[in-house]
Amino acid sequence: MEFSVEGTQFSPPVKRIFDTAGTHDFQKSLTMYRLQSHLERYLKLVQGQKIPKSSQNRAVVRFVCILERLDALMDETPPRTGSARRFGDLACRDWHDRMQGELDGLLETLLPEAARRSAAELRYYLGSAFGSRERLDYGTGHELAFLAVVVALDMLGLWTEDKFTGEDMLYVWARYYALVHRLILTYNLEPAGSHGVWGLDDHLHLAYILGASQWAQDRNVPMQPSDILDPKAVARYSETNLYCNSIAFLLRVKTGHFAQHSPMLHDIAQTVPTWSKVTTGLIKMYRVEVLNKFPVVQHFWFGTGFFPWVDMAHGMSLPNYEAPSETSEKPAAGTAHTTTTTMPPPRMTANCGYGPLGRLVTPRR
Protein backbone atom coordinates (compact mmCIF):
# COMPACT_ATOMS: atom_id res chain seq x y z
CA MET A 1 0.00 0.00 0.00
CA GLU A 2 1.58 3.23 -1.18
CA PHE A 3 2.14 6.21 1.11
CA SER A 4 2.01 9.83 0.00
CA VAL A 5 2.99 12.68 2.29
CA GLU A 6 0.94 15.16 0.27
CA GLY A 7 -2.24 13.12 0.55
CA THR A 8 -1.86 12.19 4.22
CA GLN A 9 -3.31 13.94 7.23
CA PHE A 10 -1.18 13.72 10.38
CA SER A 11 -2.44 14.06 13.94
CA PRO A 12 -1.07 13.45 17.44
CA PRO A 13 -1.38 9.71 18.24
CA VAL A 14 -4.04 8.61 20.70
CA LYS A 15 -4.58 5.46 22.75
CA ARG A 16 -6.73 2.79 21.07
CA ILE A 17 -5.77 -0.43 22.86
CA PHE A 18 -7.41 -0.70 26.27
CA ASP A 19 -7.81 -4.47 26.63
CA THR A 20 -7.25 -7.77 24.87
CA ALA A 21 -10.04 -6.99 22.38
CA GLY A 22 -8.02 -4.03 21.17
CA THR A 23 -4.92 -6.22 21.08
CA HIS A 24 -6.79 -8.65 18.82
CA ASP A 25 -7.88 -5.84 16.48
CA PHE A 26 -4.30 -4.60 16.34
CA GLN A 27 -3.26 -7.87 14.71
CA LYS A 28 -5.36 -7.14 11.60
CA SER A 29 -4.53 -3.45 11.35
CA LEU A 30 -2.77 -1.52 8.61
CA THR A 31 -0.28 -0.51 11.28
CA MET A 32 0.65 -4.13 11.95
CA TYR A 33 1.10 -4.70 8.23
CA ARG A 34 3.39 -1.70 7.91
CA LEU A 35 5.51 -2.64 10.91
CA GLN A 36 5.92 -6.27 9.89
CA SER A 37 6.49 -5.72 6.18
CA HIS A 38 9.13 -3.07 6.81
CA LEU A 39 10.82 -5.23 9.44
CA GLU A 40 10.96 -8.07 6.93
CA ARG A 41 12.75 -5.83 4.46
CA TYR A 42 15.19 -4.58 7.10
CA LEU A 43 16.11 -8.14 8.07
CA LYS A 44 16.98 -8.91 4.46
CA LEU A 45 18.88 -5.65 4.16
CA VAL A 46 21.24 -6.41 7.06
CA GLN A 47 22.09 -9.95 6.01
CA GLY A 48 25.83 -10.36 5.61
CA GLN A 49 26.48 -6.84 6.91
CA LYS A 50 28.50 -5.53 9.86
CA ILE A 51 27.82 -2.58 12.12
CA PRO A 52 29.95 0.23 10.65
CA LYS A 53 31.79 2.98 12.48
CA SER A 54 30.05 5.72 10.48
CA SER A 55 27.63 6.43 7.64
CA GLN A 56 27.78 8.53 4.49
CA ASN A 57 23.98 8.75 4.21
CA ARG A 58 23.06 12.37 5.00
CA ALA A 59 19.70 11.54 6.58
CA VAL A 60 21.32 8.88 8.76
CA VAL A 61 23.95 11.39 9.87
CA ARG A 62 21.26 13.96 10.74
CA PHE A 63 19.27 11.37 12.67
CA VAL A 64 22.28 10.11 14.59
CA CYS A 65 23.00 13.72 15.56
CA ILE A 66 19.62 13.68 17.32
CA LEU A 67 20.62 10.55 19.25
CA GLU A 68 23.94 12.18 20.12
CA ARG A 69 22.15 15.23 21.48
CA LEU A 70 19.94 13.01 23.65
CA ASP A 71 23.08 11.26 24.85
CA ALA A 72 24.62 14.61 25.75
CA LEU A 73 21.52 15.41 27.81
CA MET A 74 22.58 12.63 30.18
CA ASP A 75 25.84 14.45 30.82
CA GLU A 76 23.78 17.54 31.62
CA THR A 77 21.35 15.54 33.80
CA PRO A 78 23.48 13.39 36.14
CA PRO A 79 21.93 10.90 38.57
CA ARG A 80 20.78 12.35 41.85
CA THR A 81 23.02 11.68 44.80
CA GLY A 82 21.52 10.52 48.06
CA SER A 83 18.33 9.15 46.49
CA ALA A 84 18.90 5.43 46.94
CA ARG A 85 16.29 3.43 45.01
CA ARG A 86 16.34 -0.16 43.84
CA PHE A 87 15.20 0.89 40.38
CA GLY A 88 14.91 4.20 38.62
CA ASP A 89 16.93 7.27 39.51
CA LEU A 90 14.56 10.25 39.67
CA ALA A 91 16.92 12.32 37.52
CA CYS A 92 15.65 10.25 34.61
CA ARG A 93 12.40 12.23 34.76
CA ASP A 94 14.39 15.43 34.37
CA TRP A 95 16.10 13.87 31.33
CA HIS A 96 12.72 12.99 29.82
CA ASP A 97 11.43 16.52 30.40
CA ARG A 98 14.47 18.01 28.70
CA MET A 99 14.25 15.51 25.86
CA GLN A 100 10.59 16.33 25.25
CA GLY A 101 11.42 20.03 25.33
CA GLU A 102 13.97 19.64 22.54
CA LEU A 103 12.16 17.17 20.26
CA ASP A 104 10.41 19.72 18.05
CA GLY A 105 13.64 21.56 17.31
CA LEU A 106 15.54 18.32 16.73
CA LEU A 107 12.93 17.01 14.30
CA GLU A 108 13.03 20.30 12.42
CA THR A 109 16.72 19.68 11.71
CA LEU A 110 15.90 16.22 10.40
CA LEU A 111 12.81 16.68 8.24
CA PRO A 112 12.58 18.44 4.89
CA GLU A 113 10.03 21.26 4.70
CA ALA A 114 7.46 19.13 2.87
CA ALA A 115 7.48 16.49 5.62
CA ARG A 116 7.37 18.69 8.72
CA ARG A 117 3.64 18.20 9.16
CA SER A 118 4.48 14.62 10.13
CA ALA A 119 6.35 15.82 13.24
CA ALA A 120 3.04 15.72 15.14
CA GLU A 121 3.24 11.93 14.99
CA LEU A 122 7.00 11.42 14.87
CA ARG A 123 7.59 13.27 18.13
CA TYR A 124 5.30 10.82 19.95
CA TYR A 125 7.08 7.70 18.71
CA LEU A 126 10.56 9.12 19.17
CA GLY A 127 9.66 10.43 22.62
CA SER A 128 8.34 6.97 23.55
CA ALA A 129 11.46 5.09 22.44
CA PHE A 130 13.59 5.72 25.53
CA GLY A 131 11.57 4.28 28.38
CA SER A 132 8.81 5.55 30.64
CA ARG A 133 9.13 8.81 32.53
CA GLU A 134 6.49 7.69 35.02
CA ARG A 135 7.56 4.11 35.66
CA LEU A 136 11.30 4.69 35.18
CA ASP A 137 11.58 1.54 33.10
CA TYR A 138 12.52 0.41 29.61
CA GLY A 139 11.34 -2.60 27.62
CA THR A 140 10.24 -4.06 24.31
CA GLY A 141 7.37 -1.59 23.94
CA HIS A 142 9.85 1.27 23.83
CA GLU A 143 12.01 -0.69 21.39
CA LEU A 144 8.86 -1.11 19.25
CA ALA A 145 8.37 2.67 19.31
CA PHE A 146 11.84 3.08 17.83
CA LEU A 147 10.98 0.61 15.08
CA ALA A 148 7.98 2.85 14.37
CA VAL A 149 10.33 5.84 14.04
CA VAL A 150 12.57 3.98 11.58
CA VAL A 151 9.56 2.82 9.55
CA ALA A 152 7.96 6.28 9.55
CA LEU A 153 11.14 7.94 8.28
CA ASP A 154 11.36 5.21 5.66
CA MET A 155 7.79 5.95 4.56
CA LEU A 156 8.73 9.61 4.20
CA GLY A 157 11.55 8.57 1.87
CA LEU A 158 14.10 10.11 4.21
CA TRP A 159 16.53 7.19 4.30
CA THR A 160 16.68 6.95 0.52
CA GLU A 161 17.69 10.57 -0.11
CA ASP A 162 21.10 8.93 -0.62
CA LYS A 163 21.99 5.29 -1.19
CA PHE A 164 20.73 3.41 1.88
CA THR A 165 22.46 0.14 2.76
CA GLY A 166 22.21 -2.58 5.37
CA GLU A 167 25.20 -1.01 7.09
CA ASP A 168 23.29 2.27 7.36
CA MET A 169 20.37 0.43 8.96
CA LEU A 170 22.66 -1.28 11.45
CA TYR A 171 24.39 2.01 12.24
CA VAL A 172 21.06 3.62 13.16
CA TRP A 173 20.09 0.74 15.44
CA ALA A 174 23.53 0.40 16.99
CA ARG A 175 23.59 4.07 17.94
CA TYR A 176 20.10 3.75 19.38
CA TYR A 177 21.05 0.72 21.49
CA ALA A 178 24.20 2.46 22.71
CA LEU A 179 22.00 5.30 23.98
CA VAL A 180 19.52 2.87 25.54
CA HIS A 181 22.27 0.91 27.29
CA ARG A 182 23.62 4.13 28.75
CA LEU A 183 20.15 5.21 29.90
CA ILE A 184 19.64 1.87 31.64
CA LEU A 185 22.99 2.06 33.40
CA THR A 186 22.93 5.77 34.23
CA TYR A 187 19.42 5.85 35.66
CA ASN A 188 19.14 2.21 36.75
CA LEU A 189 15.99 1.67 34.70
CA GLU A 190 13.69 -1.18 35.64
CA PRO A 191 12.82 -3.84 33.03
CA ALA A 192 9.36 -3.03 31.64
CA GLY A 193 7.00 -5.98 31.74
CA SER A 194 9.83 -8.43 32.33
CA HIS A 195 9.14 -12.16 32.42
CA GLY A 196 12.07 -12.49 34.78
CA VAL A 197 14.61 -15.14 33.91
CA TRP A 198 12.05 -16.82 31.64
CA GLY A 199 12.03 -13.95 29.19
CA LEU A 200 14.46 -13.59 26.31
CA ASP A 201 16.00 -10.40 27.73
CA ASP A 202 15.01 -7.92 30.41
CA HIS A 203 14.80 -5.05 27.95
CA LEU A 204 15.23 -6.00 24.29
CA HIS A 205 14.08 -8.36 21.55
CA LEU A 206 14.50 -6.74 18.14
CA ALA A 207 18.24 -6.41 18.71
CA TYR A 208 18.54 -10.19 18.75
CA ILE A 209 16.46 -10.59 15.59
CA LEU A 210 18.54 -8.04 13.71
CA GLY A 211 21.79 -9.54 14.95
CA ALA A 212 20.82 -13.10 14.09
CA SER A 213 19.69 -11.93 10.65
CA GLN A 214 23.13 -10.41 10.04
CA TRP A 215 24.53 -13.94 10.02
CA ALA A 216 21.47 -15.85 8.77
CA GLN A 217 22.66 -16.30 5.17
CA ASP A 218 26.40 -16.00 5.70
CA ARG A 219 28.24 -19.14 4.57
CA ASN A 220 31.41 -17.81 6.17
CA VAL A 221 29.76 -16.89 9.45
CA PRO A 222 32.48 -16.24 12.06
CA MET A 223 30.62 -17.97 14.88
CA GLN A 224 27.71 -20.35 15.38
CA PRO A 225 24.83 -19.90 17.86
CA SER A 226 26.56 -22.27 20.28
CA ASP A 227 29.61 -19.99 20.37
CA ILE A 228 27.53 -17.39 22.23
CA LEU A 229 28.42 -19.35 25.37
CA ASP A 230 32.03 -18.20 24.94
CA PRO A 231 32.39 -14.68 26.43
CA LYS A 232 35.58 -14.05 24.45
CA ALA A 233 33.81 -14.79 21.16
CA VAL A 234 30.94 -12.52 22.17
CA ALA A 235 33.35 -9.69 22.98
CA ARG A 236 35.19 -10.19 19.69
CA TYR A 237 32.07 -9.47 17.61
CA SER A 238 30.13 -7.19 19.97
CA GLU A 239 31.00 -4.08 17.96
CA THR A 240 29.95 -5.52 14.59
CA ASN A 241 26.93 -7.72 15.41
CA LEU A 242 23.82 -6.72 17.35
CA TYR A 243 23.21 -10.20 18.79
CA CYS A 244 26.69 -10.26 20.31
CA ASN A 245 26.32 -6.62 21.32
CA SER A 246 23.19 -7.47 23.30
CA ILE A 247 24.76 -10.54 24.91
CA ALA A 248 27.81 -8.46 25.86
CA PHE A 249 25.56 -5.95 27.60
CA LEU A 250 23.82 -8.77 29.48
CA LEU A 251 27.15 -10.14 30.65
CA ARG A 252 28.06 -6.66 31.84
CA VAL A 253 24.95 -6.09 33.96
CA LYS A 254 24.11 -9.63 35.10
CA THR A 255 25.83 -11.72 37.72
CA GLY A 256 25.96 -15.48 38.02
CA HIS A 257 26.00 -18.19 35.39
CA PHE A 258 24.59 -17.36 31.95
CA ALA A 259 22.28 -20.39 32.06
CA GLN A 260 20.75 -19.10 35.28
CA HIS A 261 20.13 -15.43 34.44
CA SER A 262 19.34 -15.95 30.72
CA PRO A 263 18.05 -19.53 30.34
CA MET A 264 16.21 -18.90 27.07
CA LEU A 265 19.26 -17.44 25.34
CA HIS A 266 21.31 -20.28 26.78
CA ASP A 267 18.80 -22.82 25.46
CA ILE A 268 18.89 -21.24 21.98
CA ALA A 269 22.68 -21.52 21.99
CA GLN A 270 22.51 -25.19 22.91
CA THR A 271 19.64 -26.34 20.70
CA VAL A 272 19.28 -24.14 17.60
CA PRO A 273 21.96 -25.05 15.03
CA THR A 274 21.89 -22.13 12.58
CA TRP A 275 21.43 -18.37 12.63
CA SER A 276 18.67 -18.70 10.06
CA LYS A 277 16.64 -20.83 12.46
CA VAL A 278 17.46 -18.49 15.33
CA THR A 279 16.12 -15.58 13.27
CA THR A 280 12.87 -17.27 12.27
CA GLY A 281 12.25 -18.53 15.79
CA LEU A 282 12.84 -15.11 17.33
CA ILE A 283 10.44 -13.48 14.84
CA LYS A 284 7.78 -16.01 15.81
CA MET A 285 8.43 -15.27 19.47
CA TYR A 286 8.32 -11.51 18.81
CA ARG A 287 4.85 -11.79 17.33
CA VAL A 288 3.58 -13.74 20.31
CA GLU A 289 5.38 -12.09 23.21
CA VAL A 290 5.53 -8.48 22.00
CA LEU A 291 3.12 -7.67 19.16
CA ASN A 292 0.31 -9.80 20.61
CA LYS A 293 0.71 -8.99 24.30
CA PHE A 294 -1.62 -6.37 25.77
CA PRO A 295 0.81 -5.15 28.47
CA VAL A 296 3.23 -4.20 25.68
CA VAL A 297 1.06 -2.90 22.84
CA GLN A 298 -1.31 -0.90 25.08
CA HIS A 299 1.37 1.80 25.02
CA PHE A 300 1.53 1.91 21.22
CA TRP A 301 -0.72 4.79 20.15
CA PHE A 302 -2.19 5.56 16.74
CA GLY A 303 -2.30 8.68 14.58
CA THR A 304 -3.89 9.19 11.19
CA GLY A 305 -0.76 9.15 9.04
CA PHE A 306 1.96 6.58 9.61
CA PHE A 307 0.18 4.14 11.90
CA PRO A 308 -3.61 4.56 11.73
CA TRP A 309 -6.22 2.53 13.61
CA VAL A 310 -7.53 1.05 10.35
CA ASP A 311 -8.37 -2.47 9.21
CA MET A 312 -5.81 -3.74 6.70
CA ALA A 313 -8.24 -5.81 4.63
CA HIS A 314 -11.04 -3.27 4.18
CA GLY A 315 -9.49 0.12 4.92
CA MET A 316 -12.17 0.85 7.51
CA SER A 317 -11.61 2.22 10.99
CA LEU A 318 -11.24 -0.44 13.65
CA PRO A 319 -13.55 -0.35 16.70
CA ASN A 320 -12.79 2.55 19.03
CA TYR A 321 -12.74 1.43 22.61
CA GLU A 322 -12.79 3.76 25.59
CA ALA A 323 -10.76 3.43 28.73
CA PRO A 324 -12.62 1.42 31.39
CA SER A 325 -14.13 3.58 34.12
CA GLU A 326 -12.77 3.60 37.63
CA THR A 327 -15.84 1.76 38.88
CA SER A 328 -15.92 -0.95 36.23
CA GLU A 329 -14.88 -4.42 37.20
CA LYS A 330 -11.21 -5.01 36.53
CA PRO A 331 -10.03 -8.27 34.95
CA ALA A 332 -8.40 -10.80 37.16
CA ALA A 333 -4.65 -10.61 37.45
CA GLY A 334 -2.99 -12.32 34.55
CA THR A 335 -5.96 -12.03 32.18
CA ALA A 336 -4.08 -9.75 29.81
CA HIS A 337 -1.22 -12.24 29.55
CA THR A 338 -3.19 -15.28 28.43
CA THR A 339 -3.39 -14.55 24.70
CA THR A 340 -0.65 -16.50 22.95
CA THR A 341 -1.95 -17.02 19.42
CA THR A 342 0.03 -15.39 16.66
CA MET A 343 -1.18 -13.34 13.76
CA PRO A 344 -0.69 -15.00 10.38
CA PRO A 345 1.63 -13.11 8.05
CA PRO A 346 -0.17 -10.15 6.48
CA ARG A 347 -1.31 -10.58 2.90
CA MET A 348 1.01 -8.51 0.75
CA THR A 349 -0.26 -6.39 -2.10
CA ALA A 350 1.11 -7.04 -5.55
CA ASN A 351 2.86 -3.70 -5.92
CA CYS A 352 4.27 -3.15 -2.47
CA GLY A 353 7.58 -4.92 -3.06
CA TYR A 354 7.47 -6.95 0.17
CA GLY A 355 7.04 -10.71 0.50
CA PRO A 356 5.30 -12.49 3.38
CA LEU A 357 7.26 -13.23 6.50
CA GLY A 358 6.35 -16.88 6.12
CA ARG A 359 5.77 -19.57 8.68
CA LEU A 360 8.26 -19.44 11.49
CA VAL A 361 9.39 -21.83 14.18
CA THR A 362 9.95 -20.97 17.83
CA PRO A 363 13.25 -22.21 19.27
CA ARG A 364 12.71 -24.98 21.79
CA ARG A 365 12.70 -23.62 25.32
From Swiss-Prot:
Catalytic activity: [protein]-peptidylproline (omega=180) = [protein]-peptidylproline (omega=0)
Keywords in alphabetical order: Cytoplasm, Isomerase, Nucleus, Rotamase
Coiled-coil ranges (or none): none
BP-aspect Gene Ontology terms: autophagy; DNA repair; G1/S transition of mitotic cell cycle; mitotic spindle organization; regulation of transcription by RNA polymerase II
GO cellular component: chromatin; cytoplasm; nucleus; protein phosphatase type 2A complex
The protein's Enzyme Commission number: 5.2.1.8
Sequence ranges of Low complexity compositional bias: 331-342
Compartments, as annotated in UniProt: Cytoplasm; Nucleus
Gene3D superfamilies for the chain: 1.20.120.1150
Region spans: Disordered: 321-349
An MF annotation (GO) of this entry: protein tyrosine phosphatase activator activity
InterPro entries: Phstyr_phstse_ac, PTPA_C_lid, PTPA_sf
Chief localisation class: cytoplasm
Superkingdom in the source lineage: Eukaryota
Function: PPIases accelerate the folding of proteins. It catalyzes the cis-trans isomerization of proline imidic peptide bonds in oligopeptides. Acts as a regulatory subunit for PP2A-like phosphatases modulating their activity or substrate specificity, probably by inducing a conformational change in the catalytic subunit, a direct target of the PPIase. Can reactivate inactive phosphatase PP2A-phosphatase methylesterase complexes (PP2Ai) in presence of ATP and Mg(2+) by dissociating the inactive form from the complex.
Similarity-based family: Belongs to the PTPA-type PPIase family.
Name of the protein: Serine/threonine-protein phosphatase 2A activator 1
Lineage summary: Eukaryota, Fungi, Dikarya, Ascomycota, Saccharomycotina
Gene giving rise to this polypeptide: RRD1
